[in-house]
Amino acid sequence: EDIAFGPMNLGLSYDEVEKRVEDALKMVGMENYEDKTPHHLSGGQQKRIAIAGIIAMKPELMILDEPTAGLDPDGVEKVLNIMNQLNEEGMTLIISSHDIDMISKYADKIFVLYNGEIIESGNKNKIFSDMELLKKAHLRTPITTEILYNLKESGLNVNTEKISVKDTCAEIIKAKQINE
């Protein structure tokens, strides 16, 4: 019922609404929960049902506020997989989050807000390698950035704009080989 609410208000046929609800539930891995009431679901299941309600509307854009907040690791992984699949299918996602690890993995472009104002925008390497900016915005520095800054302060010539673990490891190996 909750998932069908939006599509029904679009004036779609009963069959189209049913198909959209079925497809949305399947996408979020909740196809056997169509008759459950929300208060009988876990927090992660409730989030996935809420996302299914949006998916059933077939929007071009989805705005999510802290989509992984309060979820256990399994719930986080499920929600991130759904978001990734939606993005791969062409949906634009706007995510508001303090989860630096999630944002550094999934975001293409980042806007940093402070006191309601955009104070910086750019790609994740630019944003997450700027420790002063992160401090000003009260955001946690990614562990990879901290490692690279510590190595740089120790005298290693490393590029602090590497964010992924894979790129950070490659940068450390490269710097170690140069210093040998």
Model-inferred region functions:
Residues 37-41, 45:
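Conserved ABC ATPase signature
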Residues 97-98:
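H-loop/switch region of ABC-family ATPase nucleotide-binding domains
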Residues 62-65:
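Catalytic Walker B motif of ABC-type/P-loop ATPase nucleotide-binding domains
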Residues 8, 15-32:
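Conserved ABC ATPase "signature" region
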Residues 121-122:
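ABC ATPase "signature
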Residues 58:
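Conserved catalytic motifs of ABC-family nucleotide-binding domains
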